[in-house]
Amino acid sequence: MSLSNKLSITDVDVKGKRVLIRVDFNVPLDENKNITNPQRIAGAIPTIKHALDNGAKAVILMSHLGRPNGAVNAKYSLKPVVPKLEELLGKPVTFAPDCVGPEVEAIVNKADNGAVILLENLRFHIEEEGSSKDKEGNKTKADKAKVEEFRKGLTALGDVYVNDAFGTAHRAHSSMVGVDLPQKAAGFLMKKELDYFAKALESPQRPFLAILGGAKVSDKIQLIDNLLDKVNTLIICGGMAFTFKKVLDNLAIGDSLFDKAGAETVPKLVEKAKAKNVKIVLPTDFITADKFDKDANTGLATDKDGIPDGWMGLDCGDESIKLYKEAIDEAKTILWNGPAGVFEFEKFAGGTKATLDAVVEGCKNGKIVIIGGGDTATVAAKYGVEDKLSHVSTGGGASLELLEGKELPGVTALSSK
């Protein structure tokens, strides 16, 4: 799956056509149905405007919201999105009461002069995800013929298909892979994600550094394994580092996080790093806590003495930060996935903040810095530096699967140039 040769919305003639766009309007709503963070709606505006500015007959938007589990549930209606969307677009938006069916087709086919239509939640139909779960976790599979019918129903609403929902690209859902139109293009959000991940995974400027944090080694084995084929240097930080330190250096780690399952793969990963000539950087000092709490008492532990029993490492210390900065200074391409400590607690946010400051500085000096979604994107938002980095991915699960070397169904489904 090449990321850099996919058809983009700018390659497609939309004049006089119905443009069906899969957006990600899965926004947080409070109990009064007010949107608490409209970022995802704002993110889709350039793609929608491009279609309108280039003479689209109509723009039809489809999305999911929450997890209604294949049934209609007013709590998850997309209707509350309409006012915000109208405000950001500066034009009226028609809300369709469903996402498929004769009534919806009539609304869509009547629309012209660049009308914008928002369809109701795709996941009100079990055929979108292909299955649903009840409260006990029992799965019901969708009927194959009905899934086909649902996909035909979506296909009937457009002449050109555009996917701008990178965050759902790792899901083989009907709206991601089942729309059967001759041209299936990436929107601007999707295109930016693919371009930057191609810069890292297909043609990085070297030296290429990956910074991997987070809690469990076992969650990141595939990620580490895939990146060892691509990077020059790998910083392993966060809770995951303690498992490496204990296995490799027999360091006393006290009550710090230890991942027994992940520990078994550490020697194999380190062996691969040696074979591939990848330098692994681990922390050498730690900010410790007497309990997992924002108000915990703190201490400092080093490689020499280890972490005493009853204490746990929740962040890295100044010596480690120096090592990280050296690696960041040397690199030309930096990919960061997973914080360096428990940044949610102010006392243990120092390592993550210092790492962030160093990559922001690097970006200012021309380095390519990519933040791989999830917690690390939260860190960039917390300190308000998203616009000071080359790219902050919007897809937690999708970016992780891409970095693990997996094919993303929603990307594979797009037309190639």
UniProtKB/Swiss-Prot annotation:
UniProt superkingdom: Eukaryota
Catalytic activity: (2R)-3-phosphoglycerate + ATP = (2R)-3-phospho-glyceroyl phosphate + ADP
Binding site residues for AMP: A215, K216, K220, G239, G313, E344
Binding site for (2R)-3-phosphoglycerate: V23, D24, F25, N26, Q39, R40, S63, H64, G66, R67, L122, R123, H170, R171
Binding site for CDP: G214, D219, G238, G338, A340, F343
Binding site for ATP: A215, K220, G239, G313, E344, D375, T376
Molecular function as annotated in GO: ADP binding; ATP binding; metal ion binding; phosphoglycerate kinase activity
Residues the record lists as binding Mg(2+): A215, D219, D375
Cofactor(s) needed by this chain: Mg(2+)
Annotated EC: 2.7.2.3
Family membership: Belongs to the phosphoglycerate kinase family.
Subunit structure: Monomer.
Task performed by this protein: Catalyzes one of the two ATP producing reactions in the glycolytic pathway via the reversible conversion of 1,3-diphosphoglycerate to 3-phosphoglycerate. Both L- and D- forms of purine and pyrimidine nucleotides can be used as substrates, but the activity is much lower on pyrimidines. Negatively regulates the biosynthesis of acetyl-CoA from pyruvate in the mitochondrion.
Name of protein: Phosphoglycerate kinase
The species this protein was found in: Hypocrea rufa (Trichoderma viride)
